[in-house]
Amino acid sequence: MAPMDLSELKNRVSQAVDQMKDELVSISLDIHRNPELAFNEYKAAGWLSGFMEKQGFKVSRNVAGMETDFAAEFQSGEGGPTIAILGEYDALPEVGHACGHNIIGTSAVGAGAALKKALEGSGVNAKVLVLGTPAEEGGGG
C-alpha cells in the first residue's frame, strides 16, 4: 500500500482533534483548577498519561527519575522517523497556570493522539512519542 499523502494526513489530524475536543478541554480545565508546583504534578501527570493510555499509547512513568514524568509511545508500521512532542504541566507559586502550562500539556497529548489516529491505516511508518515534562518552571522538565 502506498503511504497516504500529506494533505489527507492533515485532514485526519484535524478531524481527530475535533472528535477529542471536549475531553481535551475538560482535562485542561481540570489541570487549571488544580495547580501543582514543580515535581508535584501528580494529578496533572495522571490525567495526561491516563488520556494517552486510553488512546492506545504504551505509557511509561518515572522514565527520567521523576515521579511525575511520563513517555507515551505509538509505532505506526516499522521504522520511520520519531515525532516527539513535549508537554509541560506545572504551575507557578501564587499565580497557578498564568503561563498556560495546563494548555501546553493538554495540547501535547491531544496532538500526539490526533497524530496516532491519522497514522493508523495510513501506510506511513513513524513513531509518535509524547513526553510529559514536569517542573519546567522549577528546574526540571
Regions found by a protein language model. Give the residues of each.
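Acidic/His- and Gly-rich active-site-bordering loop/insert found
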Residues: P3-L129
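Fold-level recognition of mixed alpha/beta catalytic cores in primary-metabolism enzymes, strongest
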Residues: G123-G141
